[in-house]
UniProtKB/Swiss-Prot annotation:
Pathway: Sulfur metabolism; hydrogen sulfide biosynthesis; hydrogen sulfide from sulfite (NADPH route): step 1/1
Pfam families in the cross-refs: NIR_SIR (PF01077), NIR_SIR_ferr (PF03460)
Disulphides: none
Quaternary state and interactors: Alpha(8)-beta(8). The alpha component is a flavoprotein, the beta component is a hemoprotein.
Gene name for this UniProt entry: cysI1
Binding site for siroheme: C492
Free-text comment on the cofactor: Binds 1 siroheme per subunit.
Protein name per Swiss-Prot or TrEMBL: Sulfite reductase [NADPH] hemoprotein beta-component
Binding site for [4Fe-4S] cluster: C443, C449, C488, C492
Amino acid sequence: MTVQTKTKGLAWQEKPLSDNERLKTESNFLRGTILDDLKDPLTGGFKGDNFQLIRFHGMYEQDDRDIRAERAEAKLEPLKFMLLRCRLPGGIIKPSQWIELDKFARENSHYRSIRLTNRQTFQFHGVPKAKLQTMHRLLHKLGLDSIATAADMNRNVLCTSNPIESELHRQAYEYAKKISEHLLPRTRGYLDVWVDGKKVQSSDDFLQEDEPILGKTYLPRKFKTAVVIPPLNDVDCYGNDLDFVAVSDGNGQLAGFNVLAGGGLSMEHGNTKTYPNISLELGFVPPEHALKAAEAVVTTQRDFGNRSDRKNARTRYTIQNMGLDNFRAEVERRMGMPFEPVRPFKFTGRGDRIGWVKGIDGNWHLTLFIESGRLVDEGGKQLLTGVLEIAKIHKGDFRITANQNLIVANVAEADKAKIEEFARTYGLIRNDVSKLRENAMSCVSFPTCPLAMAEAERVLPDFIGELDKIMAKHGTSDDYIVTRITGCPNGCGRAMLAEIGLVGKAVGRYNLHIGGDREGVRIPRLYKENITLPEILAELDDLIGKWAAERNIGEGFGDFAIRTGIVKPVLNAPVDFWDASKAVAIARA
């Protein structure tokens, strides 16, 4: 550390470091003994520190929880395998790459599926240990990798999937890529382990490594970054550690970015020292200083973030401990320049434009609704095959959206009909999807996530079906409510930016939060705790009935819940998220 312990926000330095800090220090720049574990046929998983280290390489060890008890009874270890998350800044991928990835998923993954995530990338679920090097070498051949998509690094960088404003989107996307590359770890550990298969042990090799931005112990905790183009807030910019809000010069060109910091949606049930929070405004920078600003925020979090208590290690807690003005001043000191005042911006919604839209460049873009992002051939649906068949003829690119959907982008007029034919044949275009369903989201949860407390992806379709009936009952079928289900309080389903958010508490039970907004700028308030899905539907039946009867013109469900006093707004999450009586508005910048 280069900072002094007396500096505001560093009280944690008086406490022992978390064991993860030891792990990173001793990992030989993330190599550990992973190669040794790959050769061990006695277990399907990784041992000791390697269980955590593989996360820096974009993987999590998981097992099939549906059969865990059955295997234990047979005296077998859990059916272990890995989740892999690809690094894909802005979610753009070529059809030629997709074809190879589809082949791997079918031949080598337990679930034979590809999962589109709300961080604009894809995941393989159920990859056995014996296939990991094969998988990483395939990614390398395709010009892809999975480094820094998990663990204490800057994760996959999001960028608004806006196919209409093509020039501004192109410029913003280029900065998303630049930010991603700039904040990557410099270690060759990923390549040595997964591509070259080398075992590096000597102290000389160890000393030659350098991590000028992340440091040899990397960041205190995960770090999430997004680039967003108003008025569409599809990337949920207020839920990230760092946000770059693109500002147009009025002629469709990029004038610069408003920089925000300190968003995050995870918490722990009953732990009032944890809370979700929205990101706060730091200021404006011209495009040429965007990387400087990104590095300054990251290194401030690197040096001031809590390395003793991982539950209070994200950037939002660092800002709370330092104070926003002190945090901003430290970032400006590291940038070597002050921020300019924030330029005006406004969000009007978050949903994707499902169906065909025409860009200003004359190309067409088809956004396909993919429920919970799951592409798989099962239950009479062939969604995975449908995307594969489109990939075989598509001359443009694919864009994974932050709403877990897929855009078939840059389609020529002459190719529209054939692509739509394939999409309809394989069920990728449906006429029975309500606006409510289009604006719903879930995390994966059971059976693969080890942190899951309740179902999410597997119950979302039926839950939304029941909610659709309630909407129809009250005459609101043409409207929507942003609804999200997450299986635990870690926040992967971004329920803490929903109008209706369900957070798993135990098997079959959830906490019900309401009062977020359609634009994604307000955290919902806890309304009912530890209740079942039927109980939640009964509560929502009553609330939606009131909304239908008493709402103002154009008023969303979340705004209605706040205006009518059903719940108090979360105004200052560190103070009032757990105690609504303390809800008092504060300055956000």
